């Protein structure tokens, strides 16, 4: 069972079965469509207040040769999100002699990542960056990026994202959502951040960790004895402080930014995931570009993504060192044994979710 926790009232919790499935039947898709419609009402209201509503200022000028893109993201000014977006903006301005310009709106001013993705689905926002785990309701394929221990190391991760398999996954997500995946950001190495010391796998038993409610994650961590819990991002600190949860699965950069180490000073170096973030564009906006503009945008997107990943990896390493400097305790943990324990449960859920073919392709990348 997956725990849903309200840290301000720990008695208010509920559980959902891990058998919860991705919507595949017509009736499920109908319900999802209804939910999306309701969610879009909020998303479009946000878009309207910032001048990005479809039909008003989508970004396309009267001239087919000129375009102003609006790019929303959830990061602050010094994150790889912002720095990568700025790189893309500058490359486009340079390569198109100013025909394609970009306005960047960070700090979630257009809503959280799922809301911005919904705006793109509706054609109300041109571009954004989104975590794959937040769009699995819309794209079953995006679940592949939520599988723990998917990559052998950073080199493998890079080759997957930059190679044919990464392109295939991007195309599948694009086909499922009508939002084009241009390239991949990311690069944070995820670890176990806890108020309790985790130095052996036995220490995981009964540990309540905040995680995203995606099935591969839930199944894997339950196999390790963890109690996966869902807590709103802004309430994690308080939830740990009050003892509602023991910690979370997170990368060093955001552990440092959110000061989680103040209440959860133990970091077990599980490196069970290297984050992937999707650089996306509304299909409607993409279709308004001519062939040469599309080519230029794709080239620039890949350049900006490579730069953003480099920045993210560096920030991640720097943050881990800073966390240790500020008193966080780093603990080695048996990653090989962890992978052995989760292998069979993950094999079953990967097959059940129809991800085996693409998972095998990812693992086969050399």
Identify what each model region corresponds to:
Residues 44, 50-63:
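C-terminal segment of classical bacterial N-terminal signal peptides
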Residues 1-39:
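N-terminal secretory signal peptides that target proteins for export/translocation
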Residues 65-157, 164-366:
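N-terminal secretory/targeting leader peptides
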């Amino acid at each position: 069972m997956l725990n849903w926790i309200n840290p301000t009232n720990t008695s208010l919790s509920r559980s959902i079965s891990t058998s919860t499935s991705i919507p595949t039947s017509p009736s499920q898709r109908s319900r999802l469509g209804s939910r999306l419609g309701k969610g879009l009402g909020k998303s479009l209201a946000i878009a309207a207040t910032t001048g990005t509503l479809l039909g008003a200022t989508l970004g396309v000028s009267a001239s087919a040769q000129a375009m102003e893109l609006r790019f929303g993201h959830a990061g602050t000014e010094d994150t790889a999100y912002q720095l990568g977006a700025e790189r893309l903006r500058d490359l486009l301005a340079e390569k198109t002699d100013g025909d394609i310009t970009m306005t960047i709106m960070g700090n979630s001013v257009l809503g959280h990542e799922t809301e911005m993705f919904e705006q793109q689905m509706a054609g109300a926002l041109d571009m954004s960056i989104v975590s794959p785990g937040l769009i699995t309701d819309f794209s079953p394929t995006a679940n592949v990026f939520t599988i723990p221990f998917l990559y052998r190391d950073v080199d493998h991760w890079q080759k997957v994202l930059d190679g044919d398999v990464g392109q295939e996954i991007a195309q599948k997500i694009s086909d499922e959502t009508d939002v084009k995946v241009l390239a991949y950001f990311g690069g944070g190495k995820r670890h176990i951040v806890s108020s309790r010391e985790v130095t052996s796998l036995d220490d995981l038993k009964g540990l309540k960790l905040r995680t995203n409610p995606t099935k591969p994650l839930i199944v894997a961590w339950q196999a390790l004895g963890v109690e996966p819990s869902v807590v709103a991002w802004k309430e994690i600190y308080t939830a740990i402080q009050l003892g509602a949860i023991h910690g979370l699965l997170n990368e060093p950069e955001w552990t440092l930014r959110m000061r989680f180490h103040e209440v959860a000073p133990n970091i077990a170096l599980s490196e069970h995931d290297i984050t992937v973030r999707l650089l996306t564009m509304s299909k409607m906006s993409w279709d308004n570009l001519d062939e040469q503009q599309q080519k230029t945008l794709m080239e620039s997107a890949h350049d900006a993504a490579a730069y953003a990943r480099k920045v993210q990896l560096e920030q991640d390493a720097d943050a881990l060192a800073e966390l240790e400097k500020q008193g966080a305790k780093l603990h080695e943990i048996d990653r090989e044994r962890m992978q052995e324990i989760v292998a069979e449960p993950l094999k079953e859920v990967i097959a059940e979710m129809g991800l085996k073919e693409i998972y095998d392709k990812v693992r086969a990348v050399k």
